[in-house]
Amino acid sequence: MKYELTATEARVIGCLLEKQVTTPEQYPLSVNGVVTACNQKTNREPVMNLTEQEVQEQLDNLVKRHFLRTVSGFGNRVTKYEQRFCNSEFGDLKLSAAEVALVTTLLLRGAQTPGELRSRASRMHEFSDMAEVESTLERLASREDGPYVIRLAREPGKRESRYMHLFCGDVDELSLQTSAPESASGDLQSRVEALESEVAELKQRLDSLLAHLGE
């Protein structure tokens, strides 16, 4: 597989994929928009504190690798960025809406169980049941042009195995186990995180609207 992203590149692409679906009226994103999305406190693991310069460097690298493209011209006072990572006109990677939702959530949050993924990805795609989540993960794991995700060995005392994306190369399962946050009542925690993320998104929309009205 030709995808060897750094953790920061994965964060940038994940943010653009997320905002393309959840806030299409703000997409494509400016550099400042990408910085804000990357450093969100909700629906991000780990939480990052990237500077504008660091984000600009990542954007420039991803444009050179044809994973992003710049959008400027009439009506755009600042350069904006849109993803060409998947489902672009000339790109090879084609994903369904369900696959985009899961890949995005894995890029933003790292290894997660199907239950966590269903809850956290719900704002991008409404999965009808757990079977749809699991079948989508299996498709991503068995694609001829992939695999794009891997099922990790189930940890002792856990009911579900976690899944991890492979866009940053092979997975070190031992380091993932030692760095995995302890989840108390996983489904409830996921619902709370989803609500917090929705509130943050609404605040961002309101700020954008107020700024627009003030122009």
Curated annotation (Swiss-Prot):
This is UPF0502 protein YceH. NCBIfam families: PRK11239.1. Belongs to the UPF0502 family. Signal peptide: none annotated. HAMAP family: UPF0502 (MF_01584). It comes from the Bacteria. Disulfide bonds: none annotated. It comes from Salmonella schwarzengrund (strain CVM19633).
